[in-house]
């Protein structure tokens, strides 16, 4: 069975409490359950992780280069600032990476409109709330 790493960045551990008007009321644990169910239906193993620390995300991306068939990543605010995450994803190419955001980053503050991850991802899904994770897994499964 192929494994997909589902990586989550800063503040996503606070889902369900943090700005539910923007991010919804679903917790990250519930999203993890959704991903595991979607993965099972797609024949994929899911390794679901979250960290508030950029270096952890870089380490996990590099680990995925050796252990995973693809990555779904919600880098949170690091999407807009992290050259380190961009470079880590570039270093594991051609491993497919799908970027996910719960909110539509293009309909929010202008500083959120630019993603450092998008140029090295196979695609981005944003604005569909937690469903975006399932959509990203379906898209990756179609590529694997």
From Swiss-Prot:
Please name the gene that encodes this protein: aroQ
The subunit field of the Swiss-Prot or TrEMBL record says: Homododecamer.
Organism's domain of life?
Bacteria
Identify which residues the record assigns to the active site. Answer: 23 (proton acceptor), 101 (proton donor)
GO biological process: what's one of them?
aromatic amino acid family biosynthetic process
Pfam assignment, any one: DHquinase_II
Task: Write down the InterPro entries for this protein, in alphabetical order.
Answer: DHquinase_II (IPR001874), DHquinase_II_CS (IPR018509), DHquinase_II_sf (IPR036441)
Marked site positions, Transition state stabilizer: 18
Q: What class of enzyme is it?
A: lyase
Q: What Gene3D superfamilies is this protein classified in?
A: Dehydroquinase, class II (3.40.50.9100)
List the source organism: Mesorhizobium japonicum (strain LMG 29417 / CECT 9101 / MAFF 303099)
> Could you say which protein family the record assigns here?
Belongs to the type-II 3-dehydroquinase family.
Q: Which GO terms describe its molecular function?
A: 3-dehydroquinate dehydratase activity
Positions binding substrate in this chain are: 74, 80, 87, 102-103, 112
Which parts of the chain are coiled coil? none
Biological or metabolic pathway of the protein? Metabolic intermediate biosynthesis; chorismate biosynthesis; chorismate from D-erythrose 4-phosphate and phosphoenolpyruvate: step 3/7
- Which key words tag this protein in UniProt? Amino-acid biosynthesis, Aromatic amino acid biosynthesis, Lyase
Name under which the protein is recorded: 3-dehydroquinate dehydratase
Q: What is its EC number?
A: 4.2.1.10
Which PROSITE patterns does UniProt cross-reference here?
DEHYDROQUINASE_II
């Amino acid at each position: 069975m192929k494994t997909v790493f589902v990586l989550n960045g800063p503040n996503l551990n606070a889902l369900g409490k943090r700005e539910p008007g923007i991010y919804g009321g679903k917790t990250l644990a519930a999203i993890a359950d959704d991903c595991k169910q979607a993965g099972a239906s797609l024949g994929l193993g899911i390794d679901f992780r979250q960290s508030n620390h950029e270096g952890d995300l870089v380490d996990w991306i590099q680990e995925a280069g050796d252990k995973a068939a693809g990555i779904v990543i919600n880098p949170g605010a690091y999407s807009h600032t992290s050259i380190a995450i961009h470079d880590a994803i570039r270093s594991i190419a051609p491993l497919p990476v799908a970027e996910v955001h719960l909110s539509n980053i293009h309909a929010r503050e202008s500083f959120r409109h630019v993603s450092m991850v998008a140029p090295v991802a196979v695609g981005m899904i944003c604005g569909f709330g937690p469903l975006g994770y399932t959509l990203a897994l379906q898209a990756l499964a179609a590529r694997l």
